[in-house]
UniProtKB/Swiss-Prot annotation:
Homology family: Belongs to the ATPase B chain family.
Record text on subunit structure and interactions: F-type ATPases have 2 components, F(1) - the catalytic core - and F(0) - the membrane proton channel. F(1) has five subunits: alpha(3), beta(3), gamma(1), delta(1), epsilon(1). F(0) has four main subunits: a(1), b(1), b'(1) and c(10-14). The alpha and beta chains form an alternating ring which encloses part of the gamma chain. F(1) is attached to F(0) by a central stalk formed by the gamma and epsilon chains, while a peripheral stalk is formed by the delta, b and b' chains.
Organism of derivation: Calycanthus floridus var. glaucus
Transmembrane annotation, as ranges: 26-48
Localization terms from the record: Plastid, Chloroplast thylakoid membrane
Broad class of the protein's primary localization: plastid
Topology with respect to the bilayer: Single-pass membrane protein
PANTHER family on file: ATP SYNTHASE SUBUNIT B, CHLOROPLASTIC (PTHR34264:SF3)
Gene that this sequence comes from: atpF
InterPro entries: ATP_synth_b/b'su_bac/chlpt
One cellular component term from this protein's GO annotations in UniProt: proton-transporting ATP synthase complex
A GO molecular-function annotation: proton-transporting ATP synthase activity, rotational mechanism
Protein name per UniProt: ATP synthase subunit b, chloroplastic
Keywords: ATP synthesis, CF(0), Chloroplast, Hydrogen ion transport, Ion transport, Membrane, Plastid, Thylakoid, Transmembrane, Transmembrane helix, Transport
Further comment: In plastids the F-type ATPase is also known as CF(1)CF(0).
Length: 184
């Protein structure tokens, strides 16, 4: 008991306008005060600490749930993206195959068109050569005919007499008359 009264007496000796601080001497502090302070801290701190821990626990659980939901959404999106990628790869393969076959088809079409053009040019060349040959043959024939006609006329003129002329004219008139009768 003496300690209790000594502590009250010592309170009177403390300066009121002095500094505030912790008394680190455990023997000089009042155990009752310490137990009251600790009891109050435990009583009120327990609820606050429990609320803090519950709030933290709820935040952790909600974060875990959110991350699980986000993971599920990410997995779904990944599967959709993989499906789209497979589809695009299939389409790309089809385009590639179709493109190669289209290129091959166009190549053969071009080769065939080139052969057809060459064949047409060859035919045109042959027709042109044939035409030029026919023209040359016709020119030669005309010259030969003209020369033969001139030779025949020259021979006729040199050997002709008036009686021969009269017979030729009569024969020609007879032929013209016969032709006229046929046409009428």
């Amino acid at each position: 008991m003496k300690n209790v009264t000594d502590s009250f007496v010592s309170l009177g000796h403390w300066p009121f306008a002095g500094s505030f601080g912790f008394n680190t001497d455990i023997l000089a502090t009042n155990l009752i005060n310490l137990s009251v302070v600790l009891g109050v801290l435990i009583f009120f701190g327990k609820g606050v600490l429990s609320d803090l821990l519950d709030n933290r626990k709820q935040r952790i659980w909600s974060t875990i749930r959110n991350s699980d939901e986000l993971r599920e959404v990410a997995i779904e999106q990944l599967e959709k993206a993989r499906a789209r990628l497979r589809k695009v790869e299939r389409e790309a393969d089809e385009f590639r195959v179709n493109g190669y076959s289209e290129i091959e088809r166009e190549k053969w079409n071009l080769i065939n068109a080139t052969y057809e053009n060459l064949e047409r040019l060859e035919n045109y060349k042959n027709e042109t050569i044939h035409f030029e040959q026919q023209r040359a043959i016709n020119q030669v024939r005309q010259r030969v005919f003209q020369q033969a006609l001139q030779g025949a006329l020259g021979t006729l003129n040199s050997r002709s007499n008036s009686e021969l002329h009269l017979r030729t004219i009569s024969a020609n008139i007879g032929m013209l008359g016969a032709m006229k009768e046929i046409t009428d």
